[in-house]
Structures are given as structure tokens and as C-alpha cells.
Amino acid sequence: MFSKIFLAVATNLAFATSVLAQGQPAQKRAATPEEMNTYTVISAVTLCQARKLGVDFEKSLTIGATGFYSAVAQKHGMKVPESRGKALNEQALSNGIALMTTAAAMEFCKENIPQETQDRLKAASDQMKKGGAN
């Protein structure tokens, strides 16, 4: 679901951040749920705007999610509330951000999200609800 372009951009940003951060304390706190919500809304609105300008979905997702990824990588050391203080790897973080961005974008511009993506997101959501009920 997530483009290779995003992963390449995110990897470059993470590398640049680590180079710039040398000599600084390595201990960074996980993003709070409130911060994650803010980053999610910003990335979703950006995705929606890119779609309205005619950018294809995968590129729009990359555009929207890059800032989110950068904030979590740079400010929070790849740590999110659900990671229990441990840094996520690049793939896990980018996949989670893609999912969160897409789900939030469904609230703002559902008409600009491909039907196939909507169907996959709904199926994943239904599966999580089903698993949570057991």
C-alpha cells in the first residue's frame, strides 16, 4: 500500500536527522496521543489537498505522510504511544503512518480515496474489531 518513494524519502530524512543529531542526547520521548492526532490530521489534510490538485493517490500519500514521519523520527526517535518506549523500525513506522493518514483522510475527503483502498481499510478495521471482541 505504501510507496517505495516514501520509504526512500523517509530513510534519507532519518539518516540526515541522525547525522545532525550527533553529539545531542539520544534519549527522546515517545509521541503523545495528542501529538499523534495532530500529525495525523496534518498529513491527512495534506493528502486530501494533493488529491484535489490532481496528484495520484500513492504520491499524495507520500506527500502527506512525509512530514508525519519526519516529526516522529526527529522529535520522538521513532517512538509512538503504542511502542512502549521502544523505537519502531522504518518499515513499521511508515506502514503505521500510511494507515493512520489514509484512515484520517477518509474523514476529510473520502471521495478522493480510491475505492480499492477504502475497501482494504474497511476490511482491516473490521478484522481489528473482530479480534478485539474476542
Residues covered by each model-derived region:
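Sec-dependent N-terminal signal peptides
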Residues: 4-14
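Alpha-helical interaction segments
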Residues: 5, 29, 58-59, 96-100
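N-terminal signal peptide c-region/cleavage motif recognized by signal peptidases
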Residues: 16-18
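Immediate post-signal-peptide N-terminus of mature secreted/exported proteins
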Residues: 22-59
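Compact alpha-helical subdomains of small soluble proteins
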Residues: 24, 63-134
